[in-house]
Amino acid sequence: MSASSASASSPKPGPFTPLDFQLVLLRRMADHNPDLVEEARHQLGVSIADMREANRRWQAMTRSPRARGSASRYRSVLGPPALTVPRRIGDLECEALLWPVPLWPTLRFEVLLAPNGAAWNEWLVRTPGTPGPELHTLDDLTPWSCTVDEAARAFAPARPMEGTAPTRWRLVLTAPDGSGQPRRCVAEFTWGLLQRVSFPDGA
């Protein structure tokens, strides 16, 4: 069989689905929490190969010279947003688009749009109207327990740091440990969801 005929007989990949997008979220989180990702993967009924293929296709979509803008890409993959919320940031009138994420029922995937339609932020947030976690001490900062905004509010003032990748965020904050002693730490997030807490200065 010639290469051309083999190519012609190869099935074309199906559309990129909301399930595929959840695998993209998980793929980045596997660097810090492989056990949680493994559990989630089994819950979704997919293989490691499925997760890798979804991530490969997503990277190809985002890096293609013909790539759509972020908002259009998310609409094509996730469908119309379940909720559109006006958001004022300083003097700017912005818009937040939110989609459900079945793997995390109390979270939504949010794309924050600037007035010109450009995507400023793309991350997981708590569903509007849903109570967030009780965050009082370092013991409460467990993987996948909270979002960037929730940690920043609970342990204000928190200082944002540059993330180690486009989908990662870091906050420097001070929180009491189990004995009530304040400790300075760095909370690391992927796609807006807490992954781990580190103590770079040995505090």
Description of each model-found segment:
Residues 2-12:
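N-terminal secretory targeting and juxtamembrane "stalk" segments of secreted and cell-surface proteins
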Residues 10-53, 82-134, 167-203:
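Amphipathic N-proximal alpha-helical interface segments
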Residues 60-61:
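Phosphate/adenylate-binding glycine loop and adjacent helical scaffold
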Residues 68-83, 142-161:
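Amphipathic alpha-helical segments
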Residues 135-140:
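Short, recurring structural edge motifs at helix starts
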